[in-house]
Amino acid sequence: MRESLKLSLFYFNKKERNKMNYTTQMDAAKRGIVTKEMETIAKKEGIDVKKIIECVAKGSVAIPANKNHKSLSAEGVGQGLRTKINVNLGISKDCCNVDRELEKVKKAIDMKAEAIMDLSCFGKTQEFRKRLIEMSPAMIGTVPMYDAIGFYDKELKDITAEELLDVIETHAKDGVDFMTIHAGLNREAVEIFKRNERLTNIVSRGGSLLYAWMELNNKENPFYEHFDKVLDICEKYDVTISLGDACRPGSIHDSTDASQIKELMTLGELTKRAWERNVQIIIEGPGHMSLDEIETNMKLEKKLCYNAPFYVLGPIVTDIAPGYDHITSAIGGAIAATYGADFLCYVTPAEHLRLPDLDDMKEGIIATKIAAHAADIAKGIKGAREWDNKMSVARKELDWEKMFDLAIDNEKARKYRKNSTPEVNDSCTMCGKMCAVRNMNKVMQGKDINILRNEDK
């Protein structure tokens, strides 16, 4: 396929491109059409657009780009690209201040998060969702299952399969770029879950709602049973399906168990069905997991799901650190992305405790960006190591302004420097005149150094 694809690549100017009739980014890629989104991504990543086309056609890269999201600045997720990060926000029953959530949106955009997921789960969410899509250049994701109860003002068990599908279409019409759909939790997976006891059962919010719906109605998962209808909707609007992991582990005890792996196998089968319809796929993954299991899990996903992009929550590597789960998550995320994860969902210090505030959100974004960048260095992503090398040069030269400009959080770096002023400017208050960098620079230049005298010679 690769060779035939290379032979079929051809380019169109903008006028000619607009005449082309393609349904999705994957459809365009298979036909050798260069979309404006592909051009944007090639420029951002600094790679040949031919490589983007090849990977999108195979499914190893996804471009979440709803036809109705007009403010989108497209990003690619997958093989050979920078590791992307997602920020979760949204309205809950206990915290339903729309303006406060919109402030979080602005913060996420300012901090250059590539994706924002609206996880609103209370009331009529469409107004907030539409405002989010209108103002955001970041790709937008949702979980339609969360919205169903408020959308219909019905109890969960009374919502029909058709109504659940209608919620998906509503989100698609609104311009959502990717949707988490828990299509892998079928009746077979439910029976495996029942036979294999867990410490923490099902911790996925959408997965638990879907499990409850299936049990209360004694029916098959509607997203699995009617997956072709889901594909119809996603093909129409070019929505990327983020196949949700309802059985992701909620504790390190439950990781890599029968329920998790069974669902992952089903997600692989659904991936092939989606690609046959030119619908793009991202696979969602764990979760809570000990360090020694992460590499294996990344390789399993790539094998069982045919190298589809992998989107992970953490993984959180220990369960004992509430208030610090941005750290437990960043540790796991760096390892996961090194071994194949393409997309990291941020975790904040508020995880497991409350809805995050703006400060929590910033801490979570920075921690996740550090994890993503560390993995990109290890993976050899273009430009990743150069950023660190520039910082090292600035440190050697004791160029504080350059260091601040290069810092992943320059605001915090400037604040720390300002709050603790050294005796001499070419040092900091940790070492003062004993600064190794300062003294080596002087000696290497043939100069004398002093530690006790007030002035240098």
Curated annotation (Swiss-Prot):
Enzyme class label: lyase
Record EC number: 4.1.99.17
Cofactor(s) demanded: [4Fe-4S] cluster
Gene3D superfamilies xrefs: 6.10.250.620, Radical SAM ThiC family, central domain (3.20.20.540)
Cofactor note: Binds 1 [4Fe-4S] cluster per subunit. The cluster is coordinated with 3 cysteines and an exchangeable S-adenosyl-L-methionine.
Keyword entries, A-Z: 4Fe-4S, Iron, Iron-sulfur, Lyase, Metal-binding, S-adenosyl-L-methionine, Thiamine biosynthesis, Zinc
Binding site for [4Fe-4S] cluster: 428, 431, 435
Residue sites binding Zn(2+) per the record: 288, 352
Record-linked NCBIfam families: PRK13352.1, thiC
Family note: Belongs to the ThiC family.
PANTHER family documented for this protein: PHOSPHOMETHYLPYRIMIDINE SYNTHASE, CHLOROPLASTIC (PTHR30557:SF1), THIAMINE BIOSYNTHESIS PROTEIN THIC (PTHR30557)
Protein name: Phosphomethylpyrimidine synthase
Native species: Clostridium tetani (strain Massachusetts / E88)
